[in-house]
Amino acid sequence: MDKTKILILCIGNSTRSQIAESYFKKFAGDRIQPYSAGLTPSKIHPLTRKVLAEDGIDMVGQYSKSVKEFLGKVHFQYVFTVCDLAHQQCPTIFLNAKMIHWDIEDPSTCGDLEEICIQKFREVRDTIKFHVKEWLTREN
């Protein structure tokens, strides 16, 4: 049986979509192949790696990718947008995929205090983890 292919899309592919990809990999088993990408990708935020490591997830092999890497190459059954801007600007090429939108706050806007930022990143991690588990339970 072919794996269900899903794309998690945000603007930078630095935090929210990376976290979602990690949790889909952790909880979906062999039935789903998750990908993440950004409309204008940047590097993965160091606190993304840190908060996922706290939950036992190693992001080895994950890197920030452009959505252009997948256009015309991968047929996605589902496209998840995890921020409003990505939802508004999502490429129309994904019209054949079922679109799901989770409006998740960008934790990288937390400022310069690491203790405040790490808490924001943990909150976002936990919110995304909840959404992923809930969606997988419904789709099972």
Task: Locate the predicted segments by residue.
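Conserved small-residue
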Residues: 13, 52, 79-80, 128
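Generic alpha-helical secondary structure signal
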Residues: 46, 65, 74, 115, ...
